[in-house]
A protein has these predicted regions:
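Short structural boundary motif marking the start of a folded domain
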Residues: 2-7
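Conserved hydrophobic "DFG−1" position in protein kinase catalytic cores
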Residues: 8, 22, 46, 132-133, ...
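Residue-level recognition of beta-strand termini and adjacent short loop/turns
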Residues: 11-13, 26
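Short glycine/threonine/proline-enriched tight-turn/helix- or strand-capping micro-motif at secondary-structure
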Residues: 14-21
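Glycine-rich beta-strand-centered segment in the early N-terminal region that forms part
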Residues: 21-37, 47-98, 103, 123-124, ...
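Active-site phosphate-binding/coordination module
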Residues: 43
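NAD(P)H dinucleotide-binding glycine-rich loop of Rossmann-like/cofactor-binding domains
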Residues: 93-146
Length: 146
């Protein structure tokens, strides 16, 4: 199993850079090699324990990177493309997404009130060497090389 370095939340005021399994892309997903990422106020709230984040989760949600791996079903992207990964990660299929209210995405679970922020909140985030992007068709934007 390949590994990577990632910033992992353990508890309030306890995050560590650790070796974790490197993700691989499934259908509709992409793996991005992170080249730039930020730390924002939300990350500081997580660090202080002000948001309920599951211990063991990789934090971070504002990355830029290069497509390393593409799962089946994605069009318009290729390995090596520079991309921005959206901080809001809509599923594209729930009631909110179908109404163009992506920030209220229920991730296909019918719970629209939880909103579309998933990276570093409910799934592994971007403070890592690689990021698995679900529903990549809706969650990536190409960045011109020049």
């Amino acid at each position: 199993m390949e590994t990577m370095k990632a910033t992992v939340f353990h508890s309030a005021n306890n995050i560590r850079v650790e070796e974790v399994p490197r993700p691989s892309a499934g259908v509709g997903e992409a793996v991005i090699k992170i080249t730039l990422t930020t730390i924002c106020g939300t990350d500081l709230h997580i660090l202080r324990g002000e948001y309920a984040v599951k211990p063991g989760l990789v934090i971070g949600h504002e990355p830029v990177g290069v497509i390393e791996e593409l799962g089946e079903g994605l069009t318009g992207y290729k390995i090596g493309d520079r991309v921005l990964v959206g901080a809001i990660t809509p599923c594209g299929q729930c009631r909110a997404c179908l109404s163009a209210q992506w920030a209220q995405c229920g991730h296909g679970e019918g719970v629209e009130a939880i909103g579309g922020w998933r990276f570093g909140n409910t799934i592994n985030g971007a403070q890592a060497e690689y990021l698995l992007v679900p529903n990549a068709q809706a969650n990536l934007a190409k960045i011109p090389m020049n």
